[in-house]
A protein has these predicted regions:
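Conserved phosphate-binding catalytic cores of ATP/NTP-utilizing and phosphoryl-transfer enzymes
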Residues: 154-182, 367
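DPxDG-like acidic metal-binding loop motif
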Residues: 130-147
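Glycine-rich beta-strand-to-loop/alpha-helix junction loops that act as flexible
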Residues: 124-126, 143, 188, 322-331
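A contiguous, well-structured pocket-lining segment that forms one wall/lid of small-molecule binding clefts
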Residues: 60, 75-93, 97-112, 237-322, ...
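N-terminal beta-alpha supersecondary unit
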Residues: 2-117, 123, 127
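A short helix-loop
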Residues: 5-9, 16-33, 175-180, 185-187, ...
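Conserved phosphate-binding/catalytic loops in two-lobed NTP-binding clefts
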Residues: 153-154, 322, 338-364
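Glycine-rich phosphate-binding/hydrolytic loop that grips phosphoryl groups
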Residues: 160-163, 352-391
Length: 393
């Protein structure tokens, strides 16, 4: 089986083509993996601007699909002139009536190449930015209609869980088998969640942020320190520098650990963001050393809270496995802290490869293959759902 995956939930246009390998577990080879990031375009806004994201997805997606097909040796150009039949053209026009730029590009693609040997399409249906999600969904629906290929909608957060479980050996990816129940910590720019997993594909959110997501808090704190977007890597870079030089944080720059002792599994990071602002304003101007102090204290505060909540969740759900996913899971200090926690408490830890931490098509492809392996039915009608919970997938 060959599957094409589409991911457009935020500011990365990602296309992957994978080929399933025989075996009991979900195992596959990656034939192509394309990612086009919009980070440079969104820097001026200090965050992702939804309609700009939609526009850039629309401009890029058809060409990226063609490039992925070519890299996977699945693109065969037509030798004879071909025109889309009138009835099918009308359906395509109706499907992409709100995406005229994509419509023109798709017509060129369909009339210029033969139908590729693709057996299924997986596409992110949510959560995420709905204008961006619609671009990927409409592209998937157009491909499915023109080439008569079934479509499997994927929950983006389940994709991050599956990414955490992926192992790679001899260029073959496999969804690792592990002991359940498990707990997943999903940390990104839009989500901070603790998910109980009695078994794979059965999810219950047991804790989440009441305000800012952890990645959002990193970005906002970075802006207060006049650091470039995206702020998370910049905060981490300064924090690591501070650790290496043994920098001691000034007492008046110490930060709170919000909801550390709340007794529940929920999070709140808006107070931490406000605390950073208060300390910056109190100093008036801050030098580079003070920036490193605040970055160090901020990263430590976030990590302390995450570790405490994970430890409590593991105990309450009696989990034997911790899975970490989402863009913030690439943070070196958080990874190190979770590794130490797992070793102390005696549970298994799964973290994604760094290239699978941020949004990508491989995690959507793997999740789509998992759905197919469990005989989940494809869908004909898809709707972008910006708030689709992993519980409902």
């Amino acid at each position: 089986m060959i599957l094409l995956a589409i991911e457009t939930s935020c500011d990365e246009t990602a296309i992957s083509i994978v080929k399933r390998v025989r075996g009991k577990q979900v195992r596959f080879e990656v034939l192509s993996n394309k990612i086009l990031s919009q980070i440079d375009l969104h820097t001026q806004y200090g965050g992702v601007f939804p309609m700009l994201a939609k526009r850039e997805h629309t401009k890029a997606i058809t060409q990226l699909i063609a490039e992925a097909l070519g890299e996977a040796d699945l693109l065969v150009e037509r030798t004879n002139s071909y025109h889309i039949p009138s009835a099918l053209r009308k359906k395509l026009d109706a499907q992409l009536m709100r995406e005229p730029e994509m419509l023109s590009a798709m017509k060129v693609l369909f009339e210029g190449i033969q139908k590729p040997t693709i057996d299924a399409i997986a596409v992110t249906e949510g959560p995420g930015l709905e204008p961006a999600l619609w671009v990927g969904i409409n592209a998937a629906l157009a491909l499915g209609m023109m080439w008569d290929i079934p479509i499997y909608p994927v929950n983006h957060m389940e994709g991050h869980i599956v990414a955490g479980l992926l192992s790679i050996e001899n260029d073959v990816y496999e969804i690792s088998d592990t002991d359940y129940p498990a707990t997943a910590l999903l940390i990104s720019g839009g989500h901070t969640e603790l998910v109980n997993i009695p078994k794979l594909r059965s999810y219950s959110v047991v804790g989440k942020t009441r305000d800012d997501a952890v990645g959002e808090a990193f970005d906002k704190a970075a802006r207060m320190l006049l650091l470039p977007y995206p702020g998370g890597p910049e905060i981490s870079r300064l924090a690591e520098h501070a650790r290496k030089e043994g920098l001691v944080v000034d007492e008046d720059l110490r930060l709170p650990r919000p909801m550390l002792h709340s007794g529940d599994l929920h999070f709140s990071f808006s107070g931490l963001k406000t605390a950073v602002l208060t300390r910056v304003k109190k100093r008036g101007t801050i030098n580079e050393e003070e920036k490193r102090m605040i970055a160090l204290e901020f990263e430590n505060a976030v990590t302390d809270v995450l570790v405490a909540k994970v430890k409590q969740a593991m105990y309450e759900t009696r989990s034997s496995t911790l899975i970490i996913g989402g863009g913030v899971s690439a943070n070196t200090h958080i990874r190190f802290a979770m590794k130490n926690l797992a070793e102390r408490e005696g549970f298994s830890l799964f973290v994604p490869n760094r290239n699978l931490s941020t949004d990508n098509g491989i995690m959507i492809a793997a999740t789509g293959l998992l759905h197919i392996a469990e005989d989940k039915k494809p869908k004909v009608k898809l709707v972008a759902n910006g708030s689709w919970s992993v519980e409902g997938c």
